[in-house]
From Swiss-Prot:
GO terms for biological process: lipid A biosynthetic process. It comes from Salmonella dublin (strain CT_02021853). It holds the Pfam family Acetyltransf_11. Homotrimer. Pathway: Glycolipid biosynthesis; lipid IV(A) biosynthesis; lipid IV(A) from (3R)-3-hydroxytetradecanoyl-[acyl-carrier-protein] and UDP-N-acetyl-alpha-D-glucosamine: step 1/6. Involved in the biosynthesis of lipid A, a phosphorylated glycolipid that anchors the lipopolysaccharide to the outer membrane of the cell. This is Acyl-[acyl-carrier-protein]--UDP-N-acetylglucosamine O-acyltransferase. PANTHER family: ACYL-[ACYL-CARRIER-PROTEIN]--UDP-N-ACETYLGLUCOSAMINE O-ACYLTRANSFERASE (PTHR43480), ACYL-[ACYL-CARRIER-PROTEIN]--UDP-N-ACETYLGLUCOSAMINE O-ACYLTRANSFERASE, MITOCHONDRIAL-RELATED (PTHR43480:SF1). GO terms for cellular component: cytoplasm; membrane. Its EC number is 2.3.1.129. It catalyses: a (3R)-hydroxyacyl-[ACP] + UDP-N-acetyl-alpha-D-glucosamine = a UDP-3-O-[(3R)-3-hydroxyacyl]-N-acetyl-alpha-D-glucosamine + holo-[ACP]. One of its GO terms (molecular function) is acyl-[acyl-carrier-protein]-UDP-N-acetylglucosamine O-acyltransferase activity.
């Protein structure tokens, strides 16, 4: 179903069964598959390919040569009906690739809202990207990676399968991330190691001075105290009882399977 207010360029191919919302814009030479849903006000600039069971929300801008919902690169994939979901108000720049999930990974690749995916960024099968994240040029997420809200991943950075990039993290460019990055942390290098707390980013997002001090104290317990990881976790949990900002650390530890970067 194509809303009567949507614009479809004469050279675009929109297959029967696709749903195109009000005021959406499908530009020259775009291809939209039969199981695709594109929300109100979303713009496909030109030469964009959207395939598979893909749902895109409203007011997104998707630039030329982006490919969304295509068959993933997992060799186990055998054509199962897996999905891609993208939220609202994202900017997906030129040549970005976002692949559909696998049944082994839950069947869904998900991108939230208000994100910026710069040129050539890659979001592999079964990844989850939160809200207000930035993936800079050529940033690459392997399968099953989770990127939490407000995280920034620098250009040319590669993230290993199943890693977690915590909320408000900043990963420097040309890094290789092979373990989980705790929330609020600046990481850099190959393999990425911690370089402190993302204080400037947190200030811009309105964190209180008291909250920043608590986050720094949690970071020191984890990385500067000389304690074992289990000992640091216990003391951080105690700190989280008094400071809600620190709960992000305890929640991260519960999810982490690869262990925090060291």
């Amino acid at each position: 179903m194509i809303d009567k207010s949507a614009f479809i360029h004469p050279t675009a191919i929109v297959e029967d069964g696709a749903v195109i919302g009000a005021n959406a814009h499908i530009g020259p030479f775009c291809i939209v598959g039969p199981q695709v849903e594109i929300g109100e006000g979303t713009v496909l600039k030109s030469h964009v390919a959207v395939n598979g069971q893909t749902k895109i929300g409203r007011d997104n801008e998707i630039y030329q040569f982006a490919s969304i919902g295509e068959v993933n690169q997992d060799l186990k994939y055998a054509g199962e009906p897996t999905r891609v979901e993208i939220g609202d108000r994202n900017r997906i720049r030129e040549s970005v690739t976002i692949h559909r999930g696998t049944v082994q990974g839950g069947g869904l690749t998900k991108v939230g809202s208000d994100n910026l995916l710069m040129i050539n960024a890659h979001v592999a099968h079964d990844c989850t990207v939160g809200n207000r994240c930035i993936l800079a040029n050529n940033a690459t997420l392997a399968g099953h990676v989770s990127v939490d809200d407000f995280a920034i991943i620098g250009g040319m950075t590669a993230v290993h399968q199943f890693c977690i990039i915590g909320a408000h993290v900043m990963v420097g460019g040309c890094s290789g991330v092979a373990q989980d990055v705790p929330p609020y942390v600046i990481a850099q290098g190959n393999h990425a190691t911690p370089f402190g707390v993302n204080i400037e980013g947190l200030k811009r997002r309105g964190f209180s001075r008291e909250g920043l001090v608590a986050i720094r104290n949690a970071y020191k317990l984890l990385y500067r105290s000389g304690k074992t990881l289990d000992e640091a976790k216990l003391e951080i949990a105690e700190l989280a009882e008094k400071h809600p900002e620190v709960k992000a650390f305890t929640e991260f530890f519960e999810r982490s399977t690869r262990g925090p970067i060291r």
